[in-house]
Amino acid sequence: MSQWTHVAAIFRLDSFGKISDESIYKAFGKEVTWDDLYNYDESDDTKTLPMGSEGPLEMSIWHNSDEGCMASTTVSAFGDLRDYGGSDIDKLKDWFNDCCKQFMVRQAVMHVIDEYADEPIIVQYVE
């Protein structure tokens, strides 16, 4: 039987000016499609979003249209990771904290449900 881990994370980022999508993908990791998995090259060291056996989390980027607002960007990462749990959760926490270190974070939280754990895990950014 498969082990599933369900993830919902949101990052509210502050900036002076626009944060480029490229810098977000560089910090968070790129999304990988099923075709990318089929042609996956282990020597490729490009950072990816956290990944289970059937693929990674998905990511959505929203930019505030009011360019004068400090709360400029919201990034959400979400999905269901198969064959991922237990000690992998520490890697997920490290990923979350590494993402937060790259930007001025107004607010960030991640809710994780490991189907084999007793309780959900909530990780929040604290400066």
Residue locations for each model-derived region?
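Short, extreme N-terminal segment that most often corresponds to the first beta-strand
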Residues: 1-30
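Charged interaction segments
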Residues: 23-40, 44-127
